[in-house]
UniProtKB/Swiss-Prot annotation:
Main localization (coarse): cytoplasm
UniProt name for this protein: Rho GTPase-activating protein 26
Signal sequence extent: none
Annotated phenotype, changing residue 417 to S: In JMML; somatic mutation
PTM sites of type Phosphoserine: 668, 671
GO terms for MF: GTPase activator activity; phospholipid binding; protein-macromolecule adaptor activity
Domain Rho-GAP stretches: 383-568
Domain spans labelled PH: 265-369
Amino acid sequence: MGLPALEFSDCCLDSPHFRETLKSHEAELDKTNKFIKELIKDGKSLISALKNLSSAKRKFADSLNEFKFQCIGDAETDDEMCIARSLQEFATVLRNLEDERIRMIENASEVLITPLEKFRKEQIGAAKEAKKKYDKETEKYCGILEKHLNLSSKKKESQLQEADSQVDLVRQHFYEVSLEYVFKVQEVQERKMFEFVEPLLAFLQGLFTFYHHGYELAKDFGDFKTQLTISIQNTRNRFEGTRSEVESLMKKMKENPLEHKTISPYTMEGYLYVQEKRHFGTSWVKHYCTYQRDSKQITMVPFDQKSGGKGGEDESVILKSCTRRKTDSIEKRFCFDVEAVDRPGVITMQALSEEDRRLWMEAMDGREPVYNSNKDSQSEGTAQLDSIGFSIIRKCIHAVETRGINEQGLYRIVGVNSRVQKLLSVLMDPKTASETETDICAEWEIKTITSALKTYLRMLPGPLMMYQFQRSFIKAAKLENQESRVSEIHSLVHRLPEKNRQMLQLLMNHLANVANNHKQNLMTVANLGVVFGPTLLRPQEETVAAIMDIKFQNIVIEILIENHEKIFNTVPDMPLTNAQLHLSRKKSSDSKPPSCSERPLTLFHTVQSTEKQEQRNSIINSSLESVSSNPNSILNSSSSLQPNMNSSDPDLAVVKPTRPNSLPPNPSPTSPLSPSWPMFSAPSSPMPTSSTSSDSSPVRSVAGFVWFSVAAVVLSLARSSLHAVFSLLVNFVPCHPNLHLLFDRPEEAVHEDSSTPFRKAKALYACKAEHDSELSFTAGTVFDNVHPSQEPGWLEGTLNGKTGLIPENYVEFL
């Protein structure tokens, strides 16, 4: 029920009904007044709360903006960069939103609080004042009326008329006040319908504007939100794979820590307790010590994990001798004494165990070492990049593209291991290797075929993209600019050997076809990168850092798939020069110890001095020009070459011969001299000039001189007979009775001085085995039972009871 209307005619009657109606209107005004007061109070509390909320959100945004993600590794993937940038994006959105909130709060006081206060004070307050006046006039009118009615009729007529006139005036004034009051009450009741509600509407409009601004921010944020969601999902997927790899490595380290020890530049390193003499007795201080065998340098860093840091300055000494302490000569166990060249007295050290002391002793006294004899963690098989290998890959690709290109989870779902091995044994059987490429029967499941393809690539002696280029590929993936990544990877691919590049092109063309059907098989470019990254760029050693680089391996594969036509069908824009190739090899050799397979297949390779390498290149180039113009000019060029060979050059590194099974099956007829020729080291001392000493010089020294001096002749006359080259050498090379054996029977010439079976030999250089049939060793290792092998350029010897192959030019006979 609404309020009854106040009629002006009722003011004259001033009936009880009028009074009741007026009271109901007055009660409504009181109710409205109280409500507005409470509303203003709540509105102020709301504004204060909004200010506190805005302040808290700004502080939250500032915290987000200040935090910086630190990822493992020296670079971040695109996904990691997107995630790392997300906190700053969140902070920006929140700040923008709070700026709009502050504007809304400032307007709220003007559009809500002030109008309500004004309405309550001016309108309702005026009605209250009118009521007071009305009540006062009512009381006055009623009093005068009662007094007037009590006048006696015996009064004079003039007095009665005057009293009547006075009552009429008071009544008239009362009626006017009553009419004005009724008018004001009705006015306030009508005004509150808009003057009270309108500020609330304006406040809500400001609130809606704030929310709409948030909606617009959300729309603008949508693209980044989608990108971030994808990056988070990709990172989560990589985390699952990385976690399993790290957990597997952790279990291997638990089972055998020494076998999976990382390659270190130090011969030996670890914690030792060093005895320090004090004024009153001695104390044992914990040090982290490193030892380099080549320089005989021992570095001692005082460090205790319990105290949380270093306890002094580092100290380095040069080792003179190392002696084990007798058990009865000292109370401590596992002790040994070290004498230094540049420090007087004896340094007594305590190892952590008997085995630890044995390793330190063997490292320092030149005994046969057992450190760093890590087995290659990669599974090596009989797979090769030969005609059979290409046939196997083509068969698998043909079967996949004809029968299973749309199968979901292609290459991600693995086949049964026994079936995979059986299929590989069938494909690798030489009896069936020459069959057509479509002879994989339909009985083999697609997942078995795809697993066989991946397994064969993992069985190769080295990854398809080669160990020595792995760091370069990873660095290319870490470049910020996408074009730079593609360009660098393009250049690196064209530095791969021809067979590797052909196989990689074959594989990438196939993976591009798979990715083109990703709507059916669900294998996007990113998914294929996850599958093939660790296979094509598998690390040389299992470490946490290598596992963390898997994400960049995946990026490399993604780039190869997406840009396979450009990378494999076009030449790089800026091909690398020889000097750049040399620098890249030098950086690679500086960053980690090279394995045997990583040494380049050249006669000599400079690993320290770029200037000396360029000098030798200029000498060889001049010899090439002389040979091309006149073969007899070799006599002139030899005089300029001989002084360089007579000088002892420590920068000349011996190159390990290439195993025959790792060579291409059909070398090009136009290629340089076959690398299956034995290679020789440069002489370590100047060659004698007298005929007597020349006759007695080792064949190996003469061979080294011959190879270096006439490299140009050999390259220029590759198609001519070897005896023609030999006839040119006779004119300027000191006569040696076995020189012709270098060309007729190279193995016999090399082994003439070592024809006696079961001799001992000493390693001149360190080498890490790349095959199970090879031996790993360091410089100074002594081999037993050394004798010629069936493979050119290799010897067989025994080390620690194991017999295997040794690069011939890595050792000298004792």
